[in-house]
């Protein structure tokens, strides 16, 4: 049996990311055999991961990667903001963002992609490995990508913890033959606008018919309450619909940076200034945890439950 020294425990900890006491126990159980200890930790870790997988993961990070005419964004969730500040977790999200770019935003292709330095593990398997080593439930929640033949895909990260990692990530695609550096500058400003204004659609044509009919019905009922003639009511509804578009459609929104120009006009003017038409190629906005229902815990009940065990 090999002597279980502090150096051996430290080495195992560095290789696995497991806690010091867990590493010491693993070496004791395997008579100091490091490879066997790694396997022992993995087995124990995976068993623990299965229990953790049921817990709500609504914290974490949004990661972004861009490469000229293409860009990708991914959301990886964890249970606590503490883990989001962990170097290992941040490194994982950075790597996954780059892999998302290669996978063109396809979440299934991303999950099955080989994880660099992961000893043959896929990205999905690496998530399970991290659950075991870091000790929290994690989830590769969603991914998306944008690409243009000519132009740029640029990004903006709000509340960034480091470049490309943060809470709100935005991609904006601009199609144009104009100078890429100038386009990138414009795209970043529009991406900042998207982060703040939260549009749901790029163009009016993208607003789904059901949402539009529902909005028109609500506005019509509101207008009828005024008791005005039908012709006036119709004009009131159309006016309010324009307001609705300004709230949810990016090209119809007022640019937050100047507070007076519609995004469509901003693009039109920039195209004239740069000597080439500029067309919006789309946008993606990921906000960490949006749509996830967080668990409301009753601390007293949790303590009582633990005392009964």
Curated annotation (Swiss-Prot):
Q: Where is this region: Involved in Mg(2+) ion dislocation from EF-Tu?
A: 80-83
* Subcellular compartments: Cytoplasm
Give the Gene Ontology MF terms in alphabetical order: translation elongation factor activity
User: Main location per UniProt?
Assistant: cytoplasm
A Pfam family annotated for this chain is EF_TS
- Would the keyword RNA-binding be found if you checked this record's keyword annotation? no
Name the InterPro entries on file: EF-Ts_dimer_sf (IPR036402), Transl_elong_EFTs/EF1B (IPR001816), Transl_elong_EFTs/EF1B_dimer (IPR014039), Transl_elong_Ts_CS (IPR018101), UBA-like_sf (IPR009060)
Its Gene Ontology cellular component terms are:
cytoplasm
Which keywords does the record carry?
Cytoplasm, Elongation factor, Protein biosynthesis
Q: Does the keyword Cytoplasm apply?
A: yes
What NCBIfam families would the database entry show?
tsf
Q: What does this protein do?
A: Associates with the EF-Tu.GDP complex and induces the exchange of GDP to GTP. It remains bound to the aminoacyl-tRNA.EF-Tu.GTP complex up to the GTP hydrolysis stage on the ribosome.
Q: Which family does it belong to?
A: Belongs to the EF-Ts family.
Q: What is this protein called?
A: Elongation factor Ts
Species whose genome carries this gene: Rhodospirillum rubrum (strain ATCC 11170 / ATH 1.1.1 / DSM 467 / LMG 4362 / NCIMB 8255 / S1)
């Amino acid at each position: 049996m090999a002597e279980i020294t502090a150096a051996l425990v430290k080495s195992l900890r560095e290789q696995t990311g497991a806690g010091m006491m867990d590493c010491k126990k693993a070496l004791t159980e395997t008579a100091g055999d490091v490879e066997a200890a790694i396997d022992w930790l993995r087995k124990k870790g995976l068993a623990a991961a299965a229990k953790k997988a049921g817990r709500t993961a609504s914290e974490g990070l949004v990661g972004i990667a861009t490469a000229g005419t293409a860009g990708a964004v991914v959301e990886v969730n964890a249970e606590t903001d503490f883990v989001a500040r962990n170097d290992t977790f941040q490194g994982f999200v950075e790597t996954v963002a780059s892999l998302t770019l290669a996978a063109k935003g396809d979440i299934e292709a991303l999950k099955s992609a080989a994880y660099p330095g992961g000893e043959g593990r896929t990205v999905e398997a690496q998530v399970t490995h991290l659950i075991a080593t870091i000790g929290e439930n994690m989830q590769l929640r969603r991914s998306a990508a944008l690409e243009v033949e000519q132009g740029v895909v640029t990004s903006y990260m709000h509340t960034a913890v480091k470049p490309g990692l943060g809470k709100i990530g935005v991609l904006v695609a601009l199609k144009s033959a104009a100078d890429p550096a100038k386009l990138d500058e414009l795209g970043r400003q529009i991406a900042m606008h998207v982060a703040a204004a939260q549009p749901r659609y790029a163009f009016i044509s993208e607003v789904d018919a059901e949402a539009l009919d529902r909005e028109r019905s609500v506005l019509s009922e509101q207008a009828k309450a005024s008791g005005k003639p039908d012709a006036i009511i119709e004009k009131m509804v159309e006016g309010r619909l324009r307001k609705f578009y300004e709230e949810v459609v990016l090209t119809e929104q007022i640019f937050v940076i100047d507070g007076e120009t519609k995004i469509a006009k901003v693009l039109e003017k920039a195209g004239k200034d740069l000597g080439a038409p500029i067309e919006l190629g789309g946008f993606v906005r990921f906000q960490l945890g949006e749509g996830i229902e967080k668990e409301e815990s009753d601390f007293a009940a949790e303590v009582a439950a633990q005392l009964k065990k």
